[in-house]
Amino acid sequence: LDPGILEVNILLTHLHIDHIMGLGYFKPFYNPECTVNIWGPAGSSESLIERLRRYFSPPFFPVRFRELSAKINIHEIDNSTFNIDGFTIKSEYLCHPGPTVGYRCELGGSVVSFMPDHEPSLGSSDFPHLSEWCSGYNISEKADLLFHDGQYSNSEYDRRVGWGHSSVSDAIDFGNLSKVKKMVLFHHDPAHTDMQLEEMVDKSIQGKKIDF
């Protein structure tokens, strides 16, 4: 970051290690002139700050949370709406072990939705045909851009139902259901090659009418 930026907002979807392992190396934490606002969900039995303190402690990380130099503000969210520098941000719990939230960020009529870890078919008895009770639909509907979990192929997903991740096929169906304009698939299985990812997408869109 530009050293002249003295206030930063971090939006956490959840606290699995693959999503927070870089926090300890974030330079603004060590600048006493900086204010860092952290937004994220509390755990079922621990507050957000208690969960962050567990990460910022040995053996996970040598610097303890109380030793960080910046002024740190903790904001616990659930199904919430809040504002940051003109952005209206809506958070909503998603189907993923956690607890986990996704985000809908709105500014000037444009909408970006962010759901890196999400299993949309788990929360609905009639997915992908019915939006009611579909996890994440409320914060993705008609988004200009949706970032969405694309972890598995269909065969992989069949063996991992309930793990909190989406197949590429379900992610595309979710994008269609939500009527998004553009979609970015990510949070891929690290064992997949680029060629495999392309093949998964090609197979997932065969025979489907894609509206984005």
Please state what every model-predicted region is.
Residues 1-116, 121-124, 137, 194-212:
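Binuclear metal-dependent hydrolase catalytic cores
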